[in-house]
């Protein structure tokens, strides 16, 4: 993974005769956790061999975006969230994080310098409302396509196999594939093609992921410093835990929570939250083991 200063020194293996795709996963990552990483891994594994994907990019939302869109009493700084993604050794060297000021523009310039064709794919989960059928909506000029993966947040009403098996969808998967892949073009109200939407899914057998950033914060509210030090649960689930431990915003937030920790509702919630997080972590490990 690259820091913003390393991006010009370490580059992916580009192809001269193919379009080189970079998968961009934008999100709050407040904080980043193993569920985010597994979603990225699963998407890269099953995107399809016809897409020459040379790398992937974690793109944390800005602090201002989080403050205006998320109702949270903890907003970790963009620099902290990026450093956490950069630090964790479970994130492969082919996955980068986006600097806040430059975004993917830095990577576009890199491609131009190497004289190769690079395109960007936006990675979304099934819980995201893409608004693609609202033809008055805007398609981001930075992206040639959207890869929507139902892994982890699947529901029976989300992109069912029967609905994907009809026009205007094209079937891309082959016999023996671990997932189903379908694709259709997206147009504006004038009929101009904006890009493609590809869905990868296991249908009714889709795997479930229960780990969430809000769940991490809820558990962190009810355990004290000694309990947190003795437990490996959050250390295993959160990406870049050692960076989070020394973050000033996190420390101040934790101090406020410790002041309230002895309230009856906190004590009652502790056991339930710990069990829920342990169950979610075991499920996440089974998901990875099955691949």
Predicted segment positions?
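Nucleotidyltransferase catalytic core that binds NTPs
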Residues: 1-291
């Amino acid at each position: 993974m690259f820091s913003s200063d390393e991006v010009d020194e370490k580059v992916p293996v580009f192809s001269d005769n193919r379009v080189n795709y970079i998968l961009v996963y934008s999100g709050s990552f407040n904080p980043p956790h193993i569920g985010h990483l597994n979603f990225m891994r699963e998407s890269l594994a099953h995107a399809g061999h016809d897409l020459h994907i040379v790398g992937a990019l974690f793109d944390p939302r800005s602090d201002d975006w989080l403050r205006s869109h998320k109702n949270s009493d903890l907003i970790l700084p963009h620099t902290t969230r990026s450093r956490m993604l950069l630090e964790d050794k479970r994130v492969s060297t082919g996955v980068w994080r986006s600097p806040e000021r430059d975004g993917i523009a830095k990577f576009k310039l890199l491609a131009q310098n190497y004289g190769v064709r690079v395109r960007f794919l936006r990675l979304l989960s099934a819980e995201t409302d893409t608004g693609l059928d609202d033809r008055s909506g805007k398609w981001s000029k930075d992206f040639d396509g959207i890869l929507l993966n139902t892994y982890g947040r699947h529901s029976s009403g989300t992109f069912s196999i029967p609905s994907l098996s009809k026009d205007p969808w094209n079937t891309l998967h082959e016999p023996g594939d671990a997932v189903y892949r379908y694709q259709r073009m997206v147009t504006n109200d004038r009929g101009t093609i904006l890009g493609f939407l590809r869905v990868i899914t296991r249908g009714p057998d889709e795997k479930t992921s229960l780990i969430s950033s809000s769940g991490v914060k809820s558990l962190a509210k009810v355990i004290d410093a000694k309990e947190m030090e003795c437990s490996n649960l959050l250390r295993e689930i959160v990406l870049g835990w050692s960076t989070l431990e020394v973050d000033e915003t996190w420390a101040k937030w934790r101090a406020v929570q410790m002041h309230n920790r002895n309230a009856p509702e906190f004590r009652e919630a502790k056991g339930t939250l710990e069990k829920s997080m342990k169950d979610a972590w075991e499920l996440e490990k089974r998901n990875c083991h099955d691949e």
